[in-house]
């Protein structure tokens, strides 16, 4: 098995593709409909650049900042994202990693872990809600997040229902039960060598 440490998102994506069932990876990596917004978002990173000032004597250097009153060690927030249950600890693992680096956790409404659990793992958690349902339903979601210790709300206004994919949406189980295990078994067995290698490394 390769070193558990990796330095880039591209390497994380390569490892995920090797280990996950094809349908799960396909749902994780693809955008809605033609995927135009996803491609535009990725392309926007190519338009950004850094011009570091390495010369000169600046006494205090730091990337820390504040967002909604929360202190960040660097200007990064974990975006609220679904499908994190591809890891057994799901959002809890991500929340702990973010807390370890001093950055907030954005928790999706479609998370596999509760806002109570995640807010306990990361004291700077922002809860994401969709602008759907009636006023009372929205108020209940906000109040639950507040009571759980969430420090802010991320409101998604441009999506309120499931969009299809032009290439077809893969089947993703809502829970891993016997039926789901049987259905995903062929895809898992196709990656059995990778899984056995990882299991052996954990046993030694």
Where does each model-flagged region fall?
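Single conserved hydrophobic/aromatic residue that forms the stacking wall/gate
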Residues: 194-204
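Conserved protein kinase catalytic core
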Residues: 86, 162-164, 204
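Alpha-helix-loop-beta-strand connector modules within alpha/beta enzyme cores
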Residues: 118-126, 175-188
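Glycine/aspartate-rich loop-and-adjacent alpha/beta segment that forms the canonical ThDP
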Residues: 164-178
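Glycine-rich beta-alpha junction loops
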Residues: 157-161
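Short glycine/proline- and acidic residue-enriched helix-loop micro-motifs
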Residues: 24, 28, 188, 193
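Residue-level detector of intrinsically disordered/flexible regions characterized by low predicted structural confidence
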Residues: 153, 177-181, 200-202
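N-terminal capping/small domains of soluble enzymes
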Residues: 1-147, 153
């Amino acid at each position: 098995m390769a070193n558990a440490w990796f330095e880039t998102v591209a390497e994380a994506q390569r490892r995920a593709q090797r280990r996950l069932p094809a349908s799960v990876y396909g749902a994780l990596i693809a955008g809605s409909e033609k995927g135009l917004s996803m491609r535009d978002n990725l392309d926007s990173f190519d338009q950004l650049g850094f011009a570091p000032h390495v010369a000169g004597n600046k006494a205090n250097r730091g990337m820390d900042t504040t967002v909604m009153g929360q202190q960040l060690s660097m200007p990064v927030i974990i975006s609220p994202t679904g499908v994190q249950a591809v890891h057994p600890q799901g959002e809890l693992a991500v929340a702990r990693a973010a807390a370890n680096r001093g950055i907030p956790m954005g928790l999706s409404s479609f998370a596999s872990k509760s806002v109570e659990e995640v807010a306990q793992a990361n004291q700077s958690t922002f809860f994401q809600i969709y602008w759907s349902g009636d006023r009372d339903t929205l108020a209940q979601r906000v109040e639950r997040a507040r009571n759980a210790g969430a420090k802010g709300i991320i409101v998604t206004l441009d999506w309120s229902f499931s969009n299809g994919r032009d290439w077809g949406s893969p089947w993703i189980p809502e829970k891993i039960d016997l039926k789901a295990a049987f259905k995903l078994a062929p895809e898992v067995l196709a990656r059995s060598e990778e899984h056995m290698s990882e299991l052996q490394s954990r046993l030694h």
